[in-house]
Swiss-Prot record:
Protein name: Leucine--tRNA ligase
GO MF entry, a single one: ATP binding
Stored Pfam families: tRNA-synt_1_2, tRNA-synt_1g
SUPFAM superfamilies xref list: Anticodon-binding domain of a subclass of class I aminoacyl-tRNA synthetases (SSF47323), Nucleotidylyl transferase (SSF52374), ValRS/IleRS/LeuRS editing domain (SSF50677)
Position of sequence motif 'HIGH' region: 46-56
Gene name per UniProt: leuS
């Protein structure tokens, strides 16, 4: 048998397509459907950029191995694929190439679907989707209306993250180290209207339910989400302006709120700081209560990214004062760049002696530093901030308390005096979802002079994008369209303006896994049904990159909880198990066109075949670790497949696994059987918990080496019956070919481990003479102690000549020790 990858792979890809081999059953009853139940296997779907990269190939190879394994095991498997097809790259391509975003997107989808087929991925064809399909948009717009009616979507004006290159707003989660998550441009702040999802309403539940995921999600992801939600308990209270400051502010403001997680430090407050965007600061600018230089500096602070504002501390004194709520001393007010409006109230009490940030600021501007907490075993110092817990002093009635007790007592004191209260704050902020781009799902609202913001009627959905647009990269094409935005108000039927912002593309990926559950029979009529959702969800294995830990994964959890509360489903969490695969590297760096270190999957398939690419990816490294591309290892994978295929001639044709009398076999034949079944046991462990495909494949290679040491055709046939079943999820084309020729595909099913192969006929024991290891002996497993000693004496005879054995010790299953004297 000569291995021809092109011929084999084309044959089986056509067979699978013709026989609809990967469509799940719609019969959900255990009696007539799949008795073992369901498995929902899902990889994070791709943006249709035009060509798959090796990161994609790794992602989908892992999920495909899971899907094929569970089909063999008798489960009803849903393994769908789709395309996250809205987004800015399509518009950027339109500007660069003069192509329409829609054409560019769907041409790329067609090409990538061909790549999926050429790699042998076992996706359900009936449930393919693209999030830019009008049907998908229709259902999503309906959900948006439901969320608006529930009070979970609102519109307000505020300072937003703005990417000057992408010309659109970014959510907080999409700003990475002060830069745009997509194009890496520096992000600035811009004052504008924005739609928000009330994700903060679910902050407590999103945090608490992380405990439900501890057995199935990587700890790193759980920690990242916990830190992003950032729940903190503390004291909220108001600071009151003194008479002079009230007068300066025209009596428009008499107080402002601050929040602190360290109420035990309150006696050490030496200044208060406002965010540049704070309403008091804005009022002073609008009413010329500060000079032009100050106004200019404040504008610079506003335009800086949140990351930049945390680096170099800067501030401006406002010549305002507030009264300390306990000591009644005056506290100066500053504008400080490190204070952000999207945490707490946009105002902080500053305690330089016990906060490093406040300390740096105070040192820079020569502000007082007053220590009020000292270490339990030492004195206080003002050379650096003491941020640990300690003992209070110079704190009136709270002197001598430790920090933890003092926090509780001080909060109680504020509540008794009705000047403050215990409060919980979150770093998590509401999710801003409107984008000033064309290629996205239109937000289904209109602006009416008489009625305000009005929801579109559901019978008018979808609100589809116009195709006759011009994309220049300047401004929002929908805003500039001559007719599309003009419409009638759904409420009063007067002239109105359609909302021209489109949805953040993370909205589409927040529910696509639910859409895949829809029955193809009702695909056009409903987004999904409760019956289908109840059967398929949650996703049993979800595979994707860790870079989505606080974007997609958090948003998907939020949408699931919202949909539950809207009555669409009855569970809390969407993904039972999460596998975050490592990056694919070449020359020690992440693959990228700019570095010139990419590998084209099409070229690998052309030269070696899809099975080689799949085998290398699963064998080179465990899926959670980084994978270093190695051309020699790819060549090695190809050679193994070639040998595996060609040596199948040693197996005889049969429709059942051969029955073998193990006791009658030679030592080499028994060893070969043992190695085959060891590989089978390893495969069960891989799909259960470990995910170490490399150890499973290594086990198959060991079995092949053992098989080559014997010639029994029954042993070869049994081995190939099992090994092709083990390897079919990894190299499906060649295994399907071997199985069809030798076993009529009967063996691609769950295999039974034969325990007798692990029972050893003999044992190897070490023999020591006066404590020195001299040789090894092989003894029958059932040998008596006298028989073992007889064999040991014979094997060690040359060390015993002329000597007297004075003691013989047998350590069961380990060694024989002979003690001698001259």
């Amino acid at each position: 048998m000569i291995y021809n990858s092109k011929e084999l792979e084309k044959k089986w890809q056509e067979y699978w397509a013709k026989n609809r081999s990967f469509e799940p059953s719609e019969d959900f009853t255990k009696e007539t459907g799949c008795p073992r139940g369901k498995k929902y296997i899902l990889s994070m779907f791709p943006f249709p950029s035009g060509r798959l990269h090796m990161g994609h190939v790794r992602n989908y190879t892992i999920s495909d191995a899971f899907a094929r394994y569970y089909r063999q095991e008798g489960f009803n498997v849903l393994h769908p694929i789709g395309f996250d097809s809205f987004g800015m790259p399509a518009e950027n391509a339109a500007i660069k190439n003069g192509s329409h975003p829609k054409k560019w997107t769907y041409d790329n989808i067609d090409y990538m679907k061909g790549e999926f087929k050429s790699l042998g991925f076992s996706f359900s064809k009936d449930r393919e989707l693209a999030t830019s399909d009008e049907l998908y948009t229709k259902f999503e717009q309906g959900f948006i209306i439901d969320m608006y009616e529930k009070g979970l979507l609102y519109r307000k004006k505020g300072f937003l993250n703005w990417c000057p290159s992408c010309h659109t707003v970014l959510a907080n989660e999409q700003v990475i180290d002060g830069s745009c998550w997509r194009c890496d441009s520096s992000v600035v702040k811009k004052d504008m209207n924005q739609y928000y999802f009330k994700i903060t309403q679910y902050g407590d539940e999103l945090l608490a339910d992380l405990s439900k995921l501890e057995s199935g999600w990587p700890k790193q992801v759980l920690t990242m989400q916990e830190n992003w939600i950032g729940k903190s308990n503390g004291l909220e209270f108001k600071l009151s302006f003194d008479e002079k400051s009230l007068e300066k502010l025209d009596n428009k403001f008499d107080t402002f709120s601050v929040f602190t997680t360290r109420p035990d430090t309150i006696y050490g407050v030496s200044y208060a700081a406002l965010a540049p965007e704070h309403e008091i600061v804005s009022y002073m600018i609008e009413n010329a209560l500060v000079g032009s230089d100050t106004i200019e500096k404040i504008k610079e602070m506003k335009n800086a990214s949140s990351i930049e504002r945390q680096k170099e501390k800067s501030g401006i004194a406002l010549n305002l004062h507030v009264v300390h709520p306990l000591t009644k001393k005056l506290i100066p007010i500053w504008v400080a760049n490190f204070v952000l409006m999207d945490y707490g109230s946009g105002a902080v009490m500053a305690v330089p002696a016990h906060d490093e940030r406040d300390f740096d600021f105070a040192k820079k501007y020569n502000l007082p530093i007053k220590a009020v907490i000292k270490p339990f075993d030492g004195e206080s110092s003002i050379e650096s901030a003491f941020t640990e817990v300690g003992e209070l002093f110079d704190s009136e009635m709270f002197n001598g308390l430790n920090s933890k007790d003092a926090q509780l007592k001080i909060i109680e004191h504020f509540e008794e005096k009705k000047i403050g209260k215990k409060t919980t704050n979150y770093k998590l902020k509401d999710w801003g979802v409107s984008r000033q781009r064309y290629w996205g799902a239109p937000i289904p609202f209109v602006h009416c002079d008489s009625c305000g913001i009005v929801m579109e009627k559901k019978e008018n959905l979808p609100i589809a994008l116009p195709e006759d647009i011009e994309i220049t990269g300047e401004g929002n094409p929908l805003e500039k369209h001559p007719t599309w935005k003009y419409c009638k108000c759904p409420k009063c039927d007067k002239d109105a303006i359609r909302e021209t912002d489109t949805m953040d593309t993370f909205v589409e990926s927040s529910w696509y896994f639910l859409r895949f559950c829809a029955s193809p029979k009702n695909w056009l009529n409903e987004a999904f049904s409760k019956e289908q959702i109840k059967y398929w969800m949650g996703v049993d294995h979800y595979i994707g990159g860790i870079e989505h830990a606080i974007l997609h994964l958090l948003y998907a959890r939020f949408f699931t909880k919202v949909f539950r509360d809207l009555g669409y489903l009855e569970f809390d969490e969407p993904f039972n198990k999460l596998l975050t695969q490592g990056m694919v590297l070449k020359d020690g760096a992440k693959m990228s066109k700019s570095k010139g270190n990419t590998v084209d999957p099409d070229a690998i398939i052309e030269k070696y075949g899809a099975d080689t690419a799949r085998l290398f990816i699963l064998f080179a490294a465990p899926p959670t670790q980084e994978l270093e591309w190695n051309d020699n290892a790819v060549e090695g994978a190809f050679k193994f497949i070639k040998r595996f295929y060609e040596r199948s001639v040693n197996a005889i044709k049969t429709n059942t696994i051969p029955k073998i009398n193990h006791a009658s076999l030679s030592k080499e034949e028994k060893f070969a059987r043992k190695k085959v079944y060891e590989a089978l046991v390893r495969s069960r462990e891989v799909y259960g918990e470990k995910y170490t495909f490399n150890t499973m494949i290594a086990g198959v290679m060991e079995a092949m080496n053992a098989l080559n040491l014997q010639t029994n055709s029954d042993v070869w046939s049994e081995a190939y019956w099992i090994l092709t079943s083990i390897m079919e999820p990894v190299i499906p084309h060649v295994c399907s070919e071997i199985s069809s020729v030798k076993f009529s595909l009967k063996n691609l099913s769950s295999q039974i481990v034969v325990q007798e192969v692990f029972v050893e006929d003999s044992l190897m024991l070490g023999v020591t003479v006066n404590g020195k290891r001299r040789c090894e002996i092989e003894v029958p497993t059932e040998a008596t102690q006298d028989e073992i000693l007889q064999i040991a004496r014979e094997s060690a005879s040359k060390w015993l000549e002329g000597k007297t054995i004075i003691k013989e010790i047998v350590v069961p299953k380990k060694l024989v020790n002979l003690v001698i004297k001259d």
